[in-house]
UniProtKB/Swiss-Prot annotation:
UniProt xrefs under NCBIfam families: PRK00405.1, rpoB
UniProt xrefs under CDD domains: RNA_pol_B_RPB2
Protein name: DNA-directed RNA polymerase subunit beta
Low complexity bias locations: 18-33
Cited Gene3D superfamilies: 2.40.50.100, 2.40.50.150, 3.90.1100.10, DNA-directed RNA polymerase, beta subunit, external 1 domain, DNA-directed RNA polymerase, subunit 2, domain 6, RNA polymerase alpha subunit dimerisation domain, RNA polymerase Rpb2, domain 2
Reported impact of residue 451 to N: In strain: vr6; rifampicin-resistant
Subunit structure: The RNAP catalytic core consists of 2 alpha, 1 beta, 1 beta' and 1 omega subunit. When a sigma factor is associated with the core the holoenzyme is formed, which can initiate transcription. Interacts with CarD, TRCF (Mfd) and RbpA.
Enzyme class: transferase
Keyword field contains ATP-binding: no
Amino acid sequence: MLEGCILADSRQSKTAASPSPSRPQSSSNNSVPGAPNRVSFAKLREPLEVPGLLDVQTDSFEWLIGSPRWRESAAERGDVNPVGGLEEVLYELSPIEDFSGSMSLSFSDPRFDDVKAPVDECKDKDMTYAAPLFVTAEFINNNTGEIKSQTVFMGDFPMMTEKGTFIINGTERVVVSQLVRSPGVYFDETIDKSTDKTLHSVKVIPSRGAWLEFDVDKRDTVGVRIDRKRRQPVTVLLKALGWTSEQIVERFGFSEIMRSTLEKDNTVGTDEALLDIYRKLRPGEPPTKESAQTLLENLFFKEKRYDLARVGRYKVNKKLGLHVGEPITSSTLTEEDVVATIEYLVRLHEGQTTMTVPGGVEVPVETDDIDHFGNRRLRTVGELIQNQIRVGMSRMERVVRERMTTQDVEAITPQTLINIRPVVAAIKEFFGTSQLSQFMDQNNPLSGLTHKRRLSALGPGGLSRERAGLEVRDVHPSHYGRMCPIETPEGPNIGLIGSLSVYARVNPFGFIETPYRKVVDGVVSDEIVYLTADEEDRHVVAQANSPIDADGRFVEPRVLVRRKAGEVEYVPSSEVDYMDVSPRQMVSVATAMIPFLEHDDANRALMGANMQRQAVPLVRSEAPLVGTGMELRAAIDAGDVVVAEESGVIEEVSADYITVMHDNGTRRTYRMRKFARSNHGTCANQCPIVDAGDRVEAGQVIADGPCTDDGEMALGKNLLVAIMPWEGHNYEDAIILSNRLVEEDVLTSIHIEEHEIDARDTKLGAEEITRDIPNISDEVLADLDERGIVRIGAEVRDGDILVGKVTPKGETELTPEERLLRAIFGEKAREVRDTSLKVPHGESGKVIGIRVFSREDEDELPAGVNELVRVYVAQKRKISDGDKLAGRHGNKGVIGKILPVEDMPFLADGTPVDIILNTHGVPRRMNIGQILETHLGWCAHSGWKVDAAKGVPDWAARLPDELLEAQPNAIVSTPVFDGAQEAELQGLLSCTLPNRDGDVLVDADGKAMLFDGRSGEPFPYPVTVGYMYIMKLHHLVDDKIHARSTGPYSMITQQPLGGKAQFGGQRFGEMECWAMQAYGAAYTLQELLTIKSDDTVGRVKVYEAIVKGENIPEPGIPESFKVLLKELQSLCLNVEVLSSDGAAIELREGEDEDLERAAANLGINLSRNESASVEDLA
């Protein structure tokens, strides 16, 4: 029933491969059938395949809905009686009892029907991809024993698509996982500023409920704060819990500070202690023993008010050594928790290192690091939605209680008690407005994949970027293998938003685990163990590239390892507990796609990882010559390629679909997505890469999507690059490009814009979509069909009509003559105004699609809307000056000049280079990876052959056999931290194959003699030449360049608006005025501040003078000066404007006969204010 909403099984395997034999083998053979043969420089065999990259989303959602697949995996883990997220909420809520306790309502067994419409239809018709949710509701009348059971509809529940996204009102959204402080008990250490004493404190933080804080102050007394109220001696709380002074002395007699606290405590007995606490918590209310007892119980010991959650209970038990190994049943505090916490704090303050709890368990006594990943957990999508459902259900609970008391007992059924509106509203509110439900980043497949794996510390219950300090943003040793230390945004969110590491997974408590190979007595075994950050701290871990022999033993007697808090040292191999599974274990997917990452500075690697997400899909994608081996898995898991579900033979292929005859005799047709618009206006297009008659295996890629080539992620193009200055045109990161890339559409991308218009009912009548538009010539209407909608294939530019629409105008007073004519000729056609949909300013393209939704065709439309038309306009954007290009190493730049091919520097065989980058962009930025990529790119393009006749050279000793020879245009991979070495690169450069003339163009140092394309003379020095992977980023000059003639003005100041969206002007600010003053350009400055800005009268007169060819009149008084006067007058200051002779001047409000006349003659609207769109401007 739910198979359509969730992904297939995770591709994770727990069996390790055998250790590498003495002669290296290439690890290029991918587990994906039909994958391109990318030869790899990897020296290590990875024992664990990369897990499903979307599992963090899909597994969590499956837990929420309690899917069969989740139940199977829970059973494999050994969970007894697993409970899904929805079941958990219903279990917590049930039973809802009325105020007398005579009636109760219970919920159980949540289940879903099939989804209402497929994903494509939901996107098309602005629907939500959702399935109806039903629960079994049982009403019990305790007085009569009567039970009424019904299946109740609880609203449409948004479902997750196969790609790990949600479709809400037609738009694709992603719910980001949230990093929060785990509930539990946290001990802290601070230095008192006045006495330099070390003070200790502890916070017991619940998932829901009041905080409990204990501390030792500078006077050496132990205090407690309940619910952040005033501090009291801790013995008051113990007495309130029923402890006598003798019991306190018996348990805490070892501690001097506890004895002194007890002496300073003036309360006697439990009752007095309870009343003392009540006065602090409820000041002003009359205290009674019963109310004080009830308050304390409700605060910490009742499940309705206080919830540590399972994870909080687990953390408290682990920290304090309580109930170790027992199943977690309760999620409230216990008296033993409070006592053990106080004892732990006292021992910590006294400098003890261990503590034995009553059960006989010995636990270490130490402070907690709040930024450690053992203390921070993930709220994944399932838990976030569950919390929102819990909010909706608690709102519904109040309604149910009220209805129980007001309705007739005999007539009550579950259906009459339940109002599902609060639940539906809570879910809608979460998906529509929560900070963690985000508009999906769909620039390219990688940006979507990274968005789903994002970890955010922001959002409700998290941090705020203003208050977050450096410590919480910093890289922590416990991030290793869990959160990428490289990929995070630049700017105010740095360190608060991260990305999940490649191999990381989330355990049932929400802690991030990472896999390790178990080491037993110095032998690396095949067993894979997942560890949380807490567990890892207790072990010694070796890195993945520690040399091991064929038996799995460490080659070196001492092994480099890391211990707790990131300490690194050499230890004997027998002391090693675990070993990393892969060198790329610490980085995220985007970072793992940067070749030679190990040679890049971290700041530039961060930019490289982020800029890959901004690459736009090109007309023809091209896989990188130099990859990292991550491209295939990233493309498949991103979900934009089409993958064969079962093995079979291709029966039929067209641009729109592929039909596969499966081996079991069934037939399956896969539909292609053709020229669809992504969330960011890029083009999502799928193309088959198989032919009729081909054999395909299950899991094989059969069609490419955007930014993929042969099933691999392909974000840019392999371009021949020369790294050299050229006449200063590539100064300051500017880039020089060959015109070949423009002419041959190498870096051309397609962008699709969606334009929408609706016809509504207005007070004056219904709007109408029509071709009959007043005062519009036939040439303008040439591309509109009989309905008034533009035809598909029409070329349109700014101002052209896409959809004709007329809106009724208010009836005007008729003259006697008009009344006479109307009486003679009958009813005159109603007056209408043109409100057509036009192409916005600065846009153009070709119409590629039209969707019409009409109430007559029974389409679902918002209230008051009769017809809705969407027009899709595609624009082919060639690369041009001002566009931004980037490599994968943070090497970004803007195109400064496009040179004719014949002017570009060329190699000795006449091959012109495609792109020239400046040498200055490398040394101080320390991203040497781009140079190594350029060298290896040249080797891959030209091919190589290592002469092994006299034996394999030393530099090639560690290379796999298939890397001793490569054909031209071979695709290679150099995995991060396990890629090609510098010596190997130098050796390969000396072994490159000659061109067809027998010449080797690039020397062993990676440099070539280049010739000036203009003169034909050689440059005086050899230049680094090779192939670099270059991406075209989403920062396109067409979206940014803008010019204004006349446009909208601000209503108050009458100054032009700003920004391209408002068709605004350029801001001439304070500093620009200073520049004008410095040059003495008085008249230019006066013009800028008056007639070009907010002199409302003057600008109309100037316009008239220009039209008539007369001299420009004197400027008047700016409107902003009048606004300033009004503001001063509003402060009760009498401000007058005086002439040079001291006479008061009356400022006119623009009622000038000449002005009105000029405006009428020229057709200028003087009341031009802010406008919703540029088309509305007169």
